């Protein structure tokens, strides 16, 4: 069953629609969402609406959780100003869908979480953190987001603990196949705000029956997002960073 993996969309409906158009040509049967539907860009409601229409299974991201708890958060800054703006525009059904997201999906052979399997708010962005993360799950395939960095950590058991290496996904198409004794921690990349120096939206399609995955990078109309950001009165760096992939 081909599984479409989406993460860190952050209200960027333009990027999401481009990804879905590309993914439809590749083919998929189900959608797993790795958190952060909202935040940063104006179309959080439309993003959640689209995820609901896809019958996506999803997990909670930190921005999703912040939006749901704004009434008790004592936080300032543009990140939270944007979330307050979005909260006023999220429809009731979409709010309810976000509120029901779990922090983790654990199916035994595979796991979905926003951050580390050890803690959904931890960034898996270093080898030592990844090594610890493998110790918190027995899943062969673990999927996460949060860092906005597309790539995979692969682990093999060694005499002094797991041997771990990292591979970034920087090509338009990045194929990954694992052996029977390997385990992986995969970040499909950010749909809405990549931070690895590449402006293209990231996503992946996983073939569980073949023990393989392909991660893709997709061009989209960043200028259209810039227009949406300007119209909403959000800070200019939010669209400027999209052109740089930072």
Question: What do the PLM-derived regions correspond to, one by one?
Answer:
Residues 1-56:
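N-terminal active-site segment of His-dependent metallophosphoesterases
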Residues 1-4, 105-112, 179-184:
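Beta-strand-turn-beta hairpins that frame and shape the catalytic cleft
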Residues 6-7, 31-36, 57-62, 113, ...:
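Active-site neighborhood of phospho(di)ester-bond hydrolases with catalytic His/Asp-centered motifs
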Residues 10-14, 39-41, 63-68, 106, ...:
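Active-site environment of divalent metal-dependent phosphoester hydrolases
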Residues 23-28, 107, 136-138, 179-180:
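Glycine-rich phosphate-binding loop signature in dinucleotide/nucleotide-binding domains
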Residues 47-48, 53-138:
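Active-site neighborhood of divalent metal-dependent phosphoester bond hydrolases
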Residues 136-160, 165-166:
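Hydrophobic, aromatic-enriched interface-forming segments
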Residues 157-246:
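Acidic, His/Gly-rich catalytic cores of divalent-metal-dependent hydrolytic chemistry
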């Amino acid at each position: 069953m081909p599984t479409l993996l989406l993460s860190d969309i952050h209200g960027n409906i333009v990027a999401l629609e481009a990804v879905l158009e590309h993914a439809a040509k590749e083919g998929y049967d189900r959608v797993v969402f790795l958190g952060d539907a909202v935040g940063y860009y104006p179309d959080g409601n439309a993003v959640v609406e689209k995820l609901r229409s896809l019958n996506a299974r999803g997990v909670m991201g930190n921005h999703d959780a912040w939006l749901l708890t704004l009434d008790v958060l004592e936080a300032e800054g543009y990140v939270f100003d944007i979330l307050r703006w979005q909260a006023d525009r999220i429809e009731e059904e979409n709010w309810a869908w976000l509120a029901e997201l779990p922090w983790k999906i654990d199916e035994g052979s595979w796991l979905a979480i926003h951050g580390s399997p050890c803690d959904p708010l931890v960034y898996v962005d270093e080898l030592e953190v990844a090594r610890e993360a493998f110790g918190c799950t027995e899943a062969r395939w673990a999927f996460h987001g949060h860092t906005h960095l597309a790539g995979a950590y692969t682990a093999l058991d060694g005499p002094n603990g797991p041997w771990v290496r990292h591979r970034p996904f920087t090509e338009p198409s990045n194929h990954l196949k694992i052996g029977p004794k390997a385990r992986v921690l995969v970040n499909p990349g950010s749909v809405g705000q990549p931070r690895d120096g590449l402006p293209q939206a990231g996503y992946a399609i996983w073939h569980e029956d073949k023990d393989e995955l392909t991660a893709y990078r997709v061009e989209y109309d960043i200028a259209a997002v810039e227009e949406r950001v300007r119209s909403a009165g959000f800070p200019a760096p939010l669209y400027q960073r999209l052109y740089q992939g930072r």
